[in-house]
């Protein structure tokens, strides 16, 4: 019998299940476990190949006769916010982002719970308990950070700490970028467009860190839930031939970037 090294990834295929993004279709996923000393290296490699991380699992779509899910990554150092995005950044100038270790808190869960109850009450995560949330945050064998977004207070300039928590993003730090694993926000702050704000903030963070990309996950044309990811240009989209560049004008370059 062949003996496999613990560091050799084994891949598995899920059974078909209803697609949560495109009605009438079914999805399948290929997945592997991110464990061992080389979990970080494997996560980097798989992310470059279109995988996403959920806890200690890396997965990507492997659907029969459907290739609608397209991995996208924003080119951070070339990105320029649009006029509307600049207005949004100005509107949220009273928010400070604080990078922390991936430690779950009751304050985070309160915002997370409110977000699910109002935005995704019928989704696959709707029944997550506080223990489920803790697992989502803590169960990582790769370099992960929790970025908390808080309202500024009169003392923020002195302490660096904000006040009320209104949003958070669980983010992996890769060798070539930041990967937004999951983000959530206070639904009563809808006028702030906090989902967009967090993406813009991650692009700025990646640029400051000298990292070329921000990985947003899957862009799905025609899906109300996922189509927004195509707005952050220039970006690259993963095709069978490699990562293809989409210019700020929306035009696709035919040759793979790397």
UniProtKB/Swiss-Prot annotation:
One of the record's GO molecular function terms: leucyl-tRNA--protein transferase activity
Disulfide bonds: none
GO annotation, biological process: ubiquitin-dependent protein catabolic process via the N-end rule pathway
Catalytically driven reaction(s): N-terminal L-glutamyl-[protein] + L-leucyl-tRNA(Leu) = N-terminal L-leucyl-L-glutamyl-[protein] + tRNA(Leu) + H(+); N-terminal L-aspartyl-[protein] + L-leucyl-tRNA(Leu) = N-terminal L-leucyl-L-aspartyl-[protein] + tRNA(Leu) + H(+)
Class of this enzyme: transferase
Highest rank taxon of the organism: Bacteria
Function: Functions in the N-end rule pathway of protein degradation where it conjugates Leu from its aminoacyl-tRNA to the N-termini of proteins containing an N-terminal aspartate or glutamate.
NCBIfam families found in the cross-reference section: PRK01305.1-3 (NF002342), PRK01305.1-4 (NF002343), PRK01305.2-3 (NF002346)
Family according to the record: Belongs to the R-transferase family. Bpt subfamily.
UniProt protein name: Aspartate/glutamate leucyltransferase
Source organism: Rhodopseudomonas palustris (strain TIE-1)
Gene that encodes it: bpt
């Amino acid at each position: 019998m062949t003996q496999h090294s613990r560091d050799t990834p084994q891949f598995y295929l899920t059974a078909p299940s209803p697609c949560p993004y495109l009605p009438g279709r079914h999805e399948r996923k290929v997945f592997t476990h991110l464990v061992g000393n080389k979990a970080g290296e494997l996560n980097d490699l798989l992310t470059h190949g279109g995988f996403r991380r959920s806890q200690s699992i890396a997965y990507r779509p492997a659907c029969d006769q459907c290739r609608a899910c397209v991995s996208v990554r924003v080119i951070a150092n070339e990105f320029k916010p649009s006029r509307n995005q600049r207005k949004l950044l100005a509107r949220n100038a009273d928010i400070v982002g604080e990078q922390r270790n991936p430690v779950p808190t009751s304050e985070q869960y309160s915002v997370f719970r409110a977000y699910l109850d109002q935005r995704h009450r019928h989704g696959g995560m709707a029944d997550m308990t506080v223990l489920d949330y803790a697992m989502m945050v803590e169960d990582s064998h790769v370099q992960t950070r929790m970025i908390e977004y808080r309202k500024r207070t009169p003392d923020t300039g002195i302490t660096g700490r904000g006040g009320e928590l209104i949003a958070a993003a669980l983010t992996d730090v890769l060798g070539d970028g930041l990967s937004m694993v999951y983000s959530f926000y206070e639904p009563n702050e809808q006028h702030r467009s906090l989902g967009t704000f967090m993406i813009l903030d991650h692009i700025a963070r990646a640029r400051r860190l000298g990292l070329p990309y921000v990985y947003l996950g899957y862009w799905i044309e025609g899906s109300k839930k996922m189509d927004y990811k195509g707005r952050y240009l220039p970006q690259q989209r993963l095709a069978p031939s490699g990562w293809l560049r989409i210019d700020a004008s929306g035009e696709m370059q035919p040759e793979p970037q790397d």
